[in-house]
From Swiss-Prot:
Protein name, entry field: WD repeat-containing protein 37
Gene name as annotated: WDR37
Skewed-composition ranges (Basic and acidic residues): 32-47
Disorder association: Neurooculocardiogenitourinary syndrome: An autosomal dominant multisystem disorder characterized by significant neurological impairment with structural brain defects and seizures, poor feeding, poor postnatal growth, ocular anomalies, dysmorphic facial features, and variable skeletal, cardiac and genitourinary defects. Death in infancy may occur.
UniProt organism field: Homo sapiens
UniProt KW keywords: Cytoplasm, Disease variant, Nucleus, Repeat, WD repeat
WD repeat positions: 154-194, 197-236, 279-318, 321-360, 365-403, 406-445, 452-493
GO cellular component: a single term: nucleus
Principal location: cytoplasm
Effect after changing residue 119 to F: In NOCGUS; no effect on interaction with PACS1 and PACS2; does not affect homodimerization
Length: 494
């Protein structure tokens, strides 16, 4: 996560780069001599030690390569038209596609000794990609109701984290790369409080288990504890924007709404924390409260996690052992246990139940960055990774996972529904999927030109008992979304 907020111009450049994923080659009907005229002039204008025969052969090869790539470019366009036609036909039949985004990352070719071999390689890759798309169609008949209820729009940069307060009044918290954290009314979507005490990206937000306190971690190498007081506005009737969790219409960048308005400018602003936790030598990427709320843990890019006393701000333990930057930390809801995730492909379980000594266990099962690991109420830990898998672990048997979920995109900060044990997976490819602890897919949240995330989804958070929204997601489209998931219907159709 960046320590500084990304500018709007950077976002536009990123959008333009994504649109320009096709190979762009100037087309011409000129003769062979005209086609190679420009490179010839350029070479002749330079002091070259190459013999004229070698230069002539080289220029001829350039011309052949240009013609070959021009043909491949035309084939590329035709194949994309066929894929678009197939998608439209399937959408009309009510089917959905998992991971049907054909990006330039899927088109991987190696240099070959001849242009004809390169052509064959590209054709084979495109056929494989098309076959993958077709084979990924799901025949499941699940039509669980997944309603988009409310969009929370007000941040001026991507949102890294989302969390729900555990005390009354229940509010939603978001942490953003725009250096602020915002508190929202869940029912109305109105911004209630802005916290502007950090001078770097706010990377996480967590609420105290029993008081109106928030804990935020930042790229400014600190974590802040601050108190808030809010009064909820009168809720307005919620429009029904339901759509089946399995139906989807692909959206394009031009459908993205204008989010430049700063609704948080009217919010009461807090600029000074109650407590600032300072011991890290790098970005503080995540933080959480230990059970009871008297201690807090932070995770940093300096490869350590720190345990603090909240009242005194003193460092109690510095947890070392990870070989690379930490990405996340999470505490157990009822026991003094902490789990930390890292780019070193592992996550570690730290046990503080015995005050005199703390033990650590290392979980090795992923092949890429572990983006998050979270506890369930029982004896399980669920981990998500950039290797596109989610693994469920038993704390009593750490040798191998008891379930593995394989997906088509990197997974960010996951969250588990405590009562029903449903895992919400936010993906890099803008999707959000729901799985049970056995690895069975239950639903995919709707995403279309009218609703859903339009950029990477960074985090998910359940709030089971809330009558309006019981699942929240946030992403780098600068918005958080509140969903109503019909969990009984979801489990009934499993």
């Amino acid at each position: 996560m960046p320590t500084e907020s990304a500018s709007c111009s950077t976002a536009r450049q990123t959008k333009q780069k994504r649109k320009s994923h096709s190979l762009s080659i100037r087309r011409t009907n000129s003769s062979e001599q005209e086609r190679t005229g420009l490179p010839r002039d350029m070479l002749e204008g330079q002091d070259s030690k190459l013999p004229s025969s070698v230069r002539s052969t080289l220029l001829e090869l350039f011309g052949q390569i240009e013609r070959e790539f021009e043909n491949l470019y035309i084939e590329n366009l035709e194949l994309r038209r066929e894929i678009d036609t197939l998608n439209e036909r399937l959408a009309a039949e009510g089917q959905a596609i998992d991971g049907a985004e054909l990006s330039k990352g899927q088109l991987k070719t190696k240099a070959s000794h001849s242009t004809s071999q390169l052509s064959q390689k590209l054709k084979t890759t495109y056929k494989a990609s098309t076959s993958k798309i077709v084979s990924s169609f799901k025949t499941t008949t699940s039509r669980a109701a997944c309603q988009l209820v409310k969009e929370y729009i007000g941040h001026r940069d991507g949102i890294w984290d989302v969390s729900v307060a555990k005390t009354q009044p229940v509010v939603l918290g978001t942490a953003s790369a725009d250096h602020t954290a915002l508190l929202w009314s869940i029912e109305t979507g109105k911004c209630l409080v802005k916290y502007a005490g950090h001078v770097g990206s706010v990377n996480s937000i967590k609420f105290h288990p029993s008081e109106q306190l928030a804990l935020t971690a930042s790229g400014d190498q600190t974590a802040h504890i601050w108190r808030y007081a809010v009064q909820l506005p009168t809720p307005q009737p919620v429009a029904d924007t339901s759509i089946s969790g399995e139906d989807e219409v692909e959206c394009s960048d031009k459908d993205e709404p204008d989010l430049d308005g700063d609704v948080s400018s009217d919010c009461p602003t807090i600029r000074v924390p109650l407590t600032s936790l300072k011991s890290h030598q790098g970005v503080v990427i995540a933080s959480d409260w230990l059970v009871g709320g008297k201690q807090a843990v932070t995770a940093s890019w300096d490869r350590t996690a720190n345990l603090y006393d909240v009242e005194t701000s003193e460092l109690v333990h510095s947890l070392t052992g990870h070989d690379q930057e930490l990405t996340h930390c999470c505490t157990h809801p009822t026991q003094r246990l902490v789990v930390t995730s890292s780019r070193d492909t592992t996550f570690r379980l730290w046990d503080f139940r015995d005050p005199s000594i703390h033990s650590v266990n290392v979980f090795q099962g992923h092949t890429d960055t572990v983006t998050s690991a979270v506890f369930t109420v029982g004896d399980n830990v669920v981990s998500g990774s950039d290797d596109r898998t989610v693994k469920v672990w038993d704390l009593k048997n750490m040798r191998s996972p008891i379930a593995t979920i394989r997906t088509d995109s990197a997974i960010n900060r996951i969250n588990v529904c405590v009562g029903q044990k449903i895992i919400a997976l936010p993906h890099d490819n803008r999707q959000v999927r729901l799985f049970d602890m056995s690895g069975v897919r239950l639903a995919r949240l709707p995403r279309s030109s009218r609703q859903g995330h339009r950029r990477m989804v960074c985090c998910s958070a359940w709030s089971e008992d809330h009558p309006v929204c019981n699942l929240f997601t946030c992403g780098f489209d600068r918005q958080a979304i509140g969903w109503n998931i019909n969990i009984p219907a979801l489990l009934q159709e499993k």
